[in-house]
C-alpha cells in the first residue's frame, strides 16, 4: 500500500487489445500515482505471459491467473478494496463488458469513480456509465489531476501547474 494508504483500481478494456495497449497507460498512470503515495492496482499485473498475444481473449484457462473465475474474483476484489476507480475508455471500438461490471460494483459500493472517454463517438456514452461516474473527463491527464486533488495529496491550484509525463 502507498504512503497515503489510498488505492486506485485502473479499469479499462482488455479483450481484443494488445498487451501493450492494455499495460502502457496503466504503467504510466501508476508511476505518477505512486509518486504521490497512492497504490495503483492493475488487472494486468502478473500477466506478462500475454505479451505475445495480438488480440487478448476474455480468458485463458491454461493460466491460473487468467481463468474466467480467477479474472472475475481478483478484479472484483481489487475494485472493492480500492478507494478510487480510474476507468479509461478512450479509443474504445466496442463496449468493454468487464469494465461495465467493475463500474457497477464500484458505484454500488460508494467508490469515487473517474471515467475517461471522448465526448462523442465512444460506444460507452450511455446514461448508466455517465451516472455511475463521480466525474467524466476526456483525458488521462485531467483524470490524474482531479484524482490527486480529490485524494487530498495535491492542492487544486498547484495541480494545474504540475508537469505530468505523457500518460496514454
For the regions a language model picked out, list residue spans one by one.
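Conserved catalytic or regulatory cores that recognize and/or transform ribose-phosphate-containing ligands
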Residues: 1-168
Amino acid at each position: 500500500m502507498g504512503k497515503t494508504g489510498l488505492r486506485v483500481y485502473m479499469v479499462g478494456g482488455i479483450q481484443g487489445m494488445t498487451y501493450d495497449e492494455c499495460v502502457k497507460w496503466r504503467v504510466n498512470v501508476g508511476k505518477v500515482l505512486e509518486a504521490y503515495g497512492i497504490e495503483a492496482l492493475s488487472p494486468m499485473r502478473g500477466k506478462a505471459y500475454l505479451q505475445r498475444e495480438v488480440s487478448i481473449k476474455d480468458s485463458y484457462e491454461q493460466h491460473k491467473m487468467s481463468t474466467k473465475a480467477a479474472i472475475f474474483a481478483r478484479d472484483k476484489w481489487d475494485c472493492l478494496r480500492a478507494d478510487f476507480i480510474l476507468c479509461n475508455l478512450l479509443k474504445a471500438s466496442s463496449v468493454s463488458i468487464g469494465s461495465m461490471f467493475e463500474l457497477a460494483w464500484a458505484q454500488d459500493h460508494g467508490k469515487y469513480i473517474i471515467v475517461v472517454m471522448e465526448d462523442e463517438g465512444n460506444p460507452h456514452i450511455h446514461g448508466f456509465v455517465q451516472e455511475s461516474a463521480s466525474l467524466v473527463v476526456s483525458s488521462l491527464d485531467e483524470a490524474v489531476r482531479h484524482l490527486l486533488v480529490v485524494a487530498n495529496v495535491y492542492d487544486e491550484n498547484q495541480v494545474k501547474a504540475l508537469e505530468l509525463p505523457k500518460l496514454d
